[in-house]
Regions:
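Conserved, mostly hydrophobic/aromatic
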Residues: 39, 47, 77, 104, ...
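Catalytic domains of carbohydrate-active enzymes, especially glycoside hydrolases
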Residues: 35-52, 119
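Short, acidic/polar
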Residues: 29-39, 103-112, 213-220
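Glycine-rich, proline-tolerant flexible connector loops at the mouths of alpha/beta enzymes
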Residues: 50-72
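Acidic/histidine-rich catalytic cores of soluble enzymes
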Residues: 19-22, 47, 150-251, 255
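Active-site beta-loop-alpha junctions enriched in small/polar residues
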Residues: 23-27, 50-54, 89-92, 128-130, ...
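Short, Lys/Arg-enriched N-terminal segments with co-localized hydrophobic residues
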Residues: 1-16
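Active-site acidic/histidine proton-transfer and metal-coordination neighborhood
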Residues: 33-34, 71, 76-79, 94-197
């Protein structure tokens, strides 16, 4: 039996659990007032909220993110006993287009302010690519690109500090922060307690490292563990000749073994938010229940 009061997901008897959530734009396409009870009913206790994707009926420009809007959303989520685990604002922080960057900075500042008004402690972001298309290129893995990213990140982290919000960066194999060592370098160089990590294991994989993925995950836990503020759960299947050769799917429907990651969370991260991605409305409830069962059965 699970007690989901205001997002606290725990087994009766006091065993600490992960707080499993859903990336909201993977859910049914319904008005928010109708959607949230469905999400709660599937066994989720929190959501990953990307305003531009999940709330398309409303503008998400900086000027639209007012205290009134935040209170409306906060009350609606509280009514349905769902936490907003993170607000996603996934823009390219290394674009060479200065006009784009001006707009992007303002969006980050506005999302951080909005998160503080919502009572949401975290804004999540990926780390970009040094081109206007926001796509992988060999220059993603250069010191020059990393320096550009860090320069752009610093004022955004400062804004997060001012509002008491955590900015969580998500390493992705095809982006500038492409692995655990690079991510550790960013954290150390900026040196802020308000800069942490959103750990998405599948996003750290590509065809070059997928064969030794457990080593990749272990390195991430060893180097980034103290700074991991949230986790994304999804899975992958091989797609030879398509895209990058790996396709993201719902957790438990592909090749991933989450045993060691779940053990880490159970031992080190009480009540951490962990949102599922790439689910469908048809399989989301099964995916989260499967993860809960795996988690319960683990001994640490």
């Amino acid at each position: 039996l699970y007690d989901g009061i205001f997002g606290v997901c725990k087994k009766i008897g006091g065993e600490i659990m992960v707080q499993f959530g859903l990336r909201l734009h993977d859910a049914e396409k319904l008005p928010l007032e109708e959607l949230l009870p469905i999400v709660k009913g599937k066994g989720f206790s929190c959501v990953h909220l990307a305003l531009s994707k999940a709330l398309k009926e409303y503008p998400c420009t900086p000027s639209a993110l007012t205290p009134g809007y935040s209170n409306y959303l906060r009350h609606l989520f509280e009514k349905n006993e769902l936490d907003i685990a993170v607000i996603g604002n996934y823009l390219n922080l290394a674009s060479p287009d200065e006009e784009y960057m001006k707009v992007a900075r303002e969006k980050y500042y506005a999302h951080i302010r909005f998160a503080s008004l919502l009572g949401c402690g975290m804004v999540g972001t990926e780390t970009g690519a040094p081109n206007v298309e926001y796509k992988y290129c060999p220059e993603c893995r250069t010191e020059k690109s990393l320096s550009i990213f860090i320069k752009e990140l610093k004022p955004i982290v400062k804004c997060a500090e001012n509002y008491g919000v955590t900015l969580a960066i998500e390493p992705v194999a095809r982006h500038i922060v492409w692995g655990p060592k690079v991510c550790r370098k960013v954290l150390d160089e900026i040196g802020s307690h308000n800069l942490q990590v959103l750990f998405d294991p599948v996003n750290m994989l590509d065809l070059d490292n997928v064969g030794h993925r457990e080593e990749v995950f272990q390195e991430a836990i060893e180097l980034l563990g103290p700074d991991i503020a949230m986790v994304h759960f999804k899975d992958f299947v091989y797609t030879p000749g398509e895209g990058y050769g790996l396709k993201s799917v719902g957790a438990g429907t592909g090749e991933m073994d989450y045993t060691n990651i779940l053990k880490f969370l159970k031992k080190e991260k009480p009540f951490i938010y962990a949102t599922l991605e790439n689910t469908t409305p048809e399989n989301a409830a099964w995916c989260v229940e499967n993860l809960k069962k795996q988690y319960d059965q683990l001994e640490v």
